[in-house]
């Protein structure tokens, strides 16, 4: 084997590595092709990631924790320490852009729902931000009606891994979801892609918000495609690690 062939082979390997590396960090994955307008960036909890996400997505998701003592919505996931980034500052950083925002409010419940609604209304009014571009998500759906009436989109963050439950336990969970949706028919439901088939079967007409952040590129390919094609699925969150 000549030196030129060896160098040629090394060049191909290096190029392949760079292509795979670039694909890993690209939001334009093959399994999402044809539906890029339907995907959003998951956990955009910093201004740097926000700036880069806005160049690649029409929708973003972020985590919020409300502090009633200071009347502040803090942008962070409870598994990570707060960086001091407030939602007011976050929205100001959008400039004139108005992406669809999926707000996972970690501690929204009946004790603080009215305060959170007032805070959100204040922030969005100042920016003249359209409420129909905002999804309010919580594990405690009892007060979501307040946000629905105010003009926001809303979603009940379901218990995870329904597909792992025994039939009796699954039945109990499904009945609870049905009760919520009967009393609040405009509320959507949100969960990870693993439970999509269950939601499709039992809640075929309900608006769904799904995240695909741990899917297999091969074994889950068909499932992800079916999720994206489903007209009742409003948005799919995907992993995004900007360079």
Region roles according to the model:
Residues 4-243:
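Phosphate-group recognition and catalysis centered on beta-loop-alpha active-site segments
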